[in-house]
Amino acid sequence: MAPLSATGSLSNMWSNPTAMPSFDDLRLETSRLILRPPRVEDLDAWSEMMLDEPTARFIGGVMPRALCWRALMTMIGAWHAAGFAMFSVIEKKSGRWIGRLGPWQPEGWPGPEIGWAIARDCWGKGYAVEGAIVATDWSFDTLGWSSVIHSINPANVPSQRVARKLGSRNLGPGKLPPPFANDLVDLWGQSRDEWRERRGQLPIEQ
């Protein structure tokens, strides 16, 4: 779905709530995961993940439930206003919400990002790579992106490994907009052409 323009389409939606785009049927699947747009009922699991310090360390730090609600509503709102945002990650075998990942590009961001955050008890299973592969495919094919980045703290070695498995390389230090302006990040990334050239060599499950 193409992003909504700032004129015409949005004003029509506000005057006609039934015109709001629906993403209820959007699902990306792998053999082990379902990726779908976030929902209000994801709040409990989202909040639990963000209360875990090792998980939250590089994604804004530990957040109380009230701030998690704001973050979740921002993600849901971005889907409706821009036509994309991160997906909720559902583990097929349990039906459980285990994280969020996918496309993200707030105002002032240094590029179109594919990001990931997986609950700590699901680390080491290859879920971040598996989900990021299909989210990257979708971003290139559906959103028409020509490149992707991953903003990664230099100390975040696990996320660096994920980026390498996706075929991305370290492009050097980057700068994020407020409220992350003081965060240290390296920008990892690759072009759409590079992605498609390597796509058949990427792992599906780890």
Region roles according to the model:
Residues 2-58, 73, 86-206:
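Acyl-donor (CoA/ACP) binding surface of acyl/acetyltransferases
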Residues 64-83:
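Active-site rim helix/loop that mediates acceptor-substrate recognition in acyltransferases
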